[in-house]
């Protein structure tokens, strides 16, 4: 089943690249006319705003260590060793570790779960 999926993926990729080359070659041979944007003058005056780098990463974004993640209980989970790391939910112990080691994005308080507390 996996081999069939890989084979179909390769065939689809080859098809996409070949159809893209057909359009490019037709455009270069002046067989297709370029599309003119009606609103191009309207957007010409607007300059693109540069994205400012955040000091911390939200859940699911790339990270290098636990201190890169925004939430107090968020941890940096790495698949395949040190590759493909992203912020995921941690626990109370994660928050305590971050409190001890992080200088930036340091948690002020660690939330405790109410599951283990006795009422009464």
Swiss-Prot record:
One of its GO terms (molecular function) is toxin activity. Belongs to the neurotoxin 05 (agouti) family. GO terms for cellular component: extracellular region. Residues 56-95 form the Agouti domain. Expressed by the venom gland. It comes from the Eukaryota. Its main location: secreted. It is found in: Secreted. Residues 1-16 form the signal peptide. This is U13-lycotoxin-Ls1d. Disulfide bonds join 56-70, 63-76, 69-87, 78-85. Contains 6 disulfide bonds. The keyword Signal applies. Residues 17-54 form a propeptide. Keywords: Disulfide bond, Knottin, Secreted, Signal, Toxin. The presence of a 'disulfide through disulfide kOR' structurally defines this protein as a knottin.
